[in-house]
Amino acid sequence: MDAQTRREREDRMETMIRQWGTSVLRTCFVCLSDAQQAEDAMQETFLKAWRNLDQFEKRNGASEKTWLMHIALNVCRDYRRSRWYRHVDMSRSLEDIPLHVNDALPEDRELLSDVLSLPEKLRQPILLYYYQDMTLEEIAEALGTSKSTVYNRLRKAEDQLRITLTGGDCYV
């Protein structure tokens, strides 16, 4: 790789980190519930993106955000499967959440706490749809599933959250 090409790759990665770094970090935190691990996962996400940038560039029309979220979710999944992760204290409080979420209203903090308590398959679509403003198509691509599966998981998660937040007294 010549110096010009390397510099172009570095510039592209710097732009991606500036543009999507916060979103990747939030996603990693919600998946891992640990600020330090989320930062490590974010770094690993961008390292994998750097290593595979050529493959991404061959995919015409692919979204950087969707590609990065797919990598981040896989990195988080690998972290959770590791033996070391099983020994991490998962009783973190919401005060550990980075990026100004602590300034949220008490109702918002309660909702976030309930979202964090959802099973992974339901938590991921909620996180990506409501907290990362991704479309159903982008979420489906990031999760490697169909749009209808994403839609169904969103509805199921919303139903569970509605029951949790209303104490089961919701008739919709």
Protein language model regions, located:
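Conserved RNAP core-binding helix
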Residues: 17, 25, 35-52
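Structural recognition of an alpha-helix C-terminal capping motif at a helix-to-coil junction
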Residues: 40-47, 62-74
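Arg/Lys-rich amphipathic alpha helix in sigma70-family domain 2
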Residues: 55, 70-90
